[in-house]
């Protein structure tokens, strides 16, 4: 009798819970189905309509954004509703909010690696950590980081010298990624990195494997569920990579602690390049030093966010420069004005601040090819987006990849015109949200200034040394509006966009170089 009673109680609880879940889903559906969007299939929702391959997804997102006139529309993946936004007025509503700071569903695949680091944390924790790390991106700290950028950039140029001798076609995307990985690893940890020279450390290998796992889970029906993911080989790959990463970072942290102690006693008053790790080792949160786990999470976040997005931006900028020789010529002339006779000099902050036209080129490139094509927030309470009611616990996805193709804000969007961003009044009101490659509002990228300086520094070195050429002479501009279903690439060398956490080209960034 006792067992029967227990069974009845458990069954009652399960039924009660089931009814509550059903009513909750029904309530959400009642709100969200009032919003325009593609018709979902049973269970999987709109999963198949958006494509299951990295190269399909960006095209589908762009096409749906145009289909709904770049206004917000809803989609459904399994039982999770998404609100897809691409209009700056709607995006301003979200990014300006001081309460919509939570990143949940779409960032869950990063959490085994980045934990509660600055990218993935939310609420009070994020706010405290953001203030704590602000000194790491002050002008004096950036000057130290740029020494690493200049030295590694010099090694990068030496590698490219060999390719320029024969003017052979090569994939810039791959080499740029190695360069930025070397830079970010050294600036994060203080340890020399040699990815450009073909050396692969445990840290490099672990980072690559973890990026592979995140990319795989993003587009896999099976692996996106934790329980099923644990049954796959990718779970073991993730475990091995995390073990290697933590072991290597623990070693580096221990070594750096000893170095800091030695510097404090033996090198007082001497200027040194301080890596990001130093900020973490000396920081105090609520009067306490950071735990080892917190330090590892923040170093991992610094490496992840400072590697892939920067590499993507530089790679696509090289592509746009290769297809627009007149614009490239103007950028090269700007470099000559800044450096004068010392054309091989170091691009310090004073010189980088003068590279106005180069910055316009980078911003115009990011309009078309944003490194982070989608950013997301989760609303924990019901919200109103410019008159549209959105149910709580919806994942609000801002489609940065589509914003630059909206004729309402950018006339002739497939024309590469850096001067679009020259308007000095263009950083107020809605104008500030027309293009947000570094996000905006309270959760704007804390390292935006350093990211821009790094991109300008590396591109400056390349522009002063090489003429950047298309894969084949005479190629058209190669900017394709994939939001239109009838879009056909202008050549086989045009990038085939895919989303592998950051925006990449499936067929690489194919260019040639010629010494100036």
Swiss-Prot record:
SUPFAM superfamilies: Cytochrome P450. It comes from the Eukaryota. This is Probable cytochrome P450 4ad1. Heme binds at residue 445. GO terms for cellular component: endoplasmic reticulum membrane. Its EC number is 1.14.-.-. Keywords: Endoplasmic reticulum, Heme, Iron, Membrane, Metal-binding, Microsome, Monooxygenase, Oxidoreductase. Belongs to the cytochrome P450 family. It is a peripheral membrane protein. May be involved in the metabolism of insect hormones and in the breakdown of synthetic insecticides. It is an enzyme of class 1 (oxidoreductase). It holds the Pfam family p450. The gene is Cyp4ad1. It is found in: Endoplasmic reticulum membrane; Microsome membrane. Its cofactor is heme. PANTHER family: CYTOCHROME P450 4C3-RELATED (PTHR24291:SF189), CYTOCHROME P450 FAMILY 4 (PTHR24291). Its main location: endoplasmic reticulum. One of its GO terms (molecular function) is monooxygenase activity.
């Amino acid at each position: 009798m006792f067992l029967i009673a227990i069974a009845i109680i458990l069954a009652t609880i399960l039924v009660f819970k089931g009814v509550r879940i059903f009513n909750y889903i029904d309530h959400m559906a009642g709100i969200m189905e009032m919003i325009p969007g593609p018709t979902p299939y049973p269970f999987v929702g709109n999963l198949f309509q958006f494509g299951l391959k990295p190269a399909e997804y960006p095209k589908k997102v762009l096409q749906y954004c145009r289909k709904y006139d770049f206004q917000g529309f809803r989609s459904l993946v399994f039982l999770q509703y998404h609100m897809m936004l691409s209009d700056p007025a709607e995006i301003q509503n979200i990014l300006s909010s001081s309460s919509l700071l939570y990143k949940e569903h779409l960032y869950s695949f990063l959490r085994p690696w980045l934990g509660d680091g600055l990218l993935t944390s939310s609420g009070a924790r994020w706010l405290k950590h953001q203030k704590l790390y602000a000194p790491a991106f002050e002008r004096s700290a950036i000057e130290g980081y740029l020494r690493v950028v200049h030295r590694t950039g010099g090694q990068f140029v030496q590698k490219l010298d060999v390719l320029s001798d024969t003017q052979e076609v090569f994939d810039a995307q791959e080499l740029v990624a190695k360069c930025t990985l070397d830079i970010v690893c050294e600036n994060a940890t203080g340890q020399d990195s040699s990815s450009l020279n073909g050396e692969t450390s445990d840290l490099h290998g672990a980072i690559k494997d973890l990026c592979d796992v995140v990319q795989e889970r993003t587009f896999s029906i099976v692996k996106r569920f934790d329980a099923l993911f644990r049954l796959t080989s990718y779970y073991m790959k993730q475990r091995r990579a995390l073990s290697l990463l933590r072991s290597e970072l623990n070693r580096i942290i221990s070594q750096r602690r000893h170095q800091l102690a030695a510097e404090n006693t033996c090198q007082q008053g001497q200027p040194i390049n301080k890596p990001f790790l130093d900020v973490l080792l000396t920081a105090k949160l609520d009067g306490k030093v950071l735990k080892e786990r917190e330090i590892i999470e923040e170093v991992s976040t610094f490496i992840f966010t400072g590697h892939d997005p920067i590499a993507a931006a530089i790679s696509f900028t090289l592509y746009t420069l290769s297809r627009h020789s007149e614009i490239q010529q103007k950028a090269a002339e700007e470099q000559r004005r800044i450096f004068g006779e010392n054309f091989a000099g170091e691009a310090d902050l004073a010189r980088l601040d003068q590279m106005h036209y180069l910055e316009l080129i980078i911003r115009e490139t990011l309009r078309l090819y944003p490194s982070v094509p989608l950013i997301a927030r989760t609303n924990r309470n019901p919200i109103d987006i410019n008159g549209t009611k959105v149910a709580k616990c919806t994942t609000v996805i801002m489609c940065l990849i589509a914003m630059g193709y909206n004729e309402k804000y950018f006339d002739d969007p497939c024309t590469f015109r850096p001067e679009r961003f020259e308007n000095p009044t263009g950083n107020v009101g809605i104008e500030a949200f027309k293009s947000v490659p570094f996000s905006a509002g309270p959760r704007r990228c804390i390292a935006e200034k350093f990211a821009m300086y790094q991109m300008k520094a590396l591109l400056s070195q390349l522009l002063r040394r090489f003429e950047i050429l298309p894969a084949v002479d005479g190629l058209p501009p190669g900017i394709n509006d994939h939001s239109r279903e009838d879009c056909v690439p202008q050549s086989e060398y045009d990038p085939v966009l895919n989303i592998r956490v950051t925006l990449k080209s499936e067929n690489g960034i194919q260019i040639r170089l010629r010494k100036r």
